[in-house]
Amino acid sequence: VLLGAWAGVRPADRRILDVGTGTGLIALMMAQRAPEALITGVDVEEVSQARENAAASPWGGRVAFVQCPVQADATKKAPAFLGKYDMIVSNPPFFVDSLTCPDEGRTTARHAVRLPFDQLRDAVVRLLAAEGRFAVILPTDEARRFTDVCRGFLALTRSTGVRTTPRRPVKRLLMEFAHENVSSGLRSDSPPVCSELVVGTGEHEQYTPEYRALTRDFYLKF
């Protein structure tokens, strides 16, 4: 939910891509936030659950799901990848260096096995519109690795460290990238706008006002 609520969607966005869509949650959040946009969700795993979720939602008519690697040749394997996207979002595989799990599905979800960071970067560079944004959420160590992989291609423009409670360390980073553009001064070494978000108060499973404000459109209990 955090990524879908935090990503910098704009009213003018018309095409949005969700990489590693899973159950389609983030894609549907994008459809809710961008009422004029067409959303495409892609995943190497089966997308039938995502399609069912979309069909049961008010936004199903603007959301399509494709079972296909985002690295696919657009002209031959995935016509959905033709053209550019105003916004790309991804909650990609992580734990790059940790041991793989015997369960292949769980391994794919938790490890950068089928979508190495350099291939994700290349796909974003290829598919992102000139003024587009790419939003991603990763554990802190993997976020640093991914930022390094993007140097020379994508510039980090915004970053939010996520803490579960005030006393816990930052566990996740929400990051937004744009195409590096030397002529406009947007470079990989340009300082991003940084902030922190604390999810819970640490008392009786209460959420902070900041987290409630960010996600209230997506939780009935808020």
What is the predicted function of each stretch?
Residues 83, 92-126:
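Mobile active-site "lid"/loop adjacent to the S-adenosyl-L-methionine
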Residues 114-170:
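Conserved Class I SAM-dependent methyltransferase catalytic core
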Residues 5-102:
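Conserved SAM/SAH cofactor-binding pocket of Class I
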Residues 3, 91, 120, 177:
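Residue-level signal for inorganic ion chemistry
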